[in-house]
Amino acid sequence: MKIVFMGTPAFSVPILKRLIDTHTVLAVVTQPDRPVGRKRLLTPSPVKEEAQKHGIPVLQPEKIREQHEDILAFAPELIVTAAYGQIVPKAVLDAPPYGCINVHASLLPKYRGGAPIHQAIIDGEKQTGISIMYMAEKLDAGAVLSQQAVAITDEDDVQTMHDKLSAVGADLLEKTIVALEQGTIEAVAQDEDKATFAPNIKREQEVLDWQKPARALFNQVRGMRPWPVAYTLVNGNRLKVWEAKEIAGEHECEPGEILATTKQGIDVACGNGTILRLTVVQPAGKKAVLANQLLQGAHPFQVGKRLGEGHE
């Protein structure tokens, strides 16, 4: 099938690769090059880099609405999107004979929006998945063609689920396109009453609230790793928490109070009498290290000190 692909981040690359292997990719539409890193060097998106390896034409409109005719000039039979990053106008959605379909990293109608992987982990979900659906003018609200569930374990974080879901997305997309060509698949409308949302992560969501139970904070740490990384304050300075674990035990201390410092990490009082052990942390301006390495010299993690003081 002749396809135009629209995507931007690393999540989209395995999906693009699969389309290149199995179909004719006429063009790729991706976000413009953006400044990256301390030197703010203009950097192409991962999707653009992959397309250029294969000599595929690349379009990078600042506003797709102002350049949609250039996309339609390729006369695709199908448009596939995966984490593109802009709302696709109706003129584009309606043009291809087979429509415009999207690869979304959740089991719709749950977790519509830009951060479905983060939010599913933060919420403590035991599974999420991939949905292939028709694009609609309303965000992630189109009729669903196919879905596949993927388990979330306590060992998973955003990176591991990102990689699993991207691979599943490529497989499911391939099967879905075959079914579209054969006319053996029907789209099912989403139940709007069951829709939930996962908008892009906001800065305030990065802050660990020690009033919450340890399990919720454990999920938050995983759901913020490797980006943007959850944090707390110690003596007014940020302490990023890369890894933590819920441990057995009870306490009657104030939430955020350091209960113990051991070779295993820093034990912190949480809500409902629960305890979270910080095992990998990153002080401001330094690299992430095992928590016990910070305890070997002078450190601010005295038993009884409260973390998080200074947050508004």
Swiss-Prot record:
List, alphabetically, the InterPro entries matched. Answer: Fmt (IPR005794), Formyl_trans_C (IPR005793), Formyl_trans_C_sf (IPR037022), Formyl_transf_N (IPR002376), Formyl_transf_N_sf (IPR036477), Formyl_transferase-like_C_sf (IPR011034), GART_AS (IPR001555), Met-tRNA-FMT_C (IPR044135)
Q: What is its EC number?
A: 2.1.2.9
Q: Which UniProt keywords apply?
A: Protein biosynthesis, Transferase
Whether Chloroplast counts among this entry's keywords is no
Record GO cellular component, one term: cytosol
An annotated Gene Ontology molecular function: methionyl-tRNA formyltransferase activity
| Annotated binding of (6S)-5,6,7,8-tetrahydrofolate, by residue | 106-109
Q: Which SUPFAM superfamilies match?
A: FMT C-terminal domain-like, Formyltransferase
Entry-linked CDD domains: FMT_core_Met-tRNA-FMT_N (cd08646), Met_tRNA_FMT_C (cd08704)
PANTHER family (UniProt xref) = METHIONYL-TRNA FORMYLTRANSFERASE (PTHR11138), METHIONYL-TRNA FORMYLTRANSFERASE, MITOCHONDRIAL (PTHR11138:SF5)
Family according to the record: Belongs to the Fmt family.
What this chain does, per the record?
A: Attaches a formyl group to the free amino group of methionyl-tRNA(fMet). The formyl group appears to play a dual role in the initiator identity of N-formylmethionyl-tRNA by promoting its recognition by IF2 and preventing the misappropriation of this tRNA by the elongation apparatus.
Q: Which protein is depicted? A: Methionyl-tRNA formyltransferase
Q: Which gene encodes it?
A: fmt
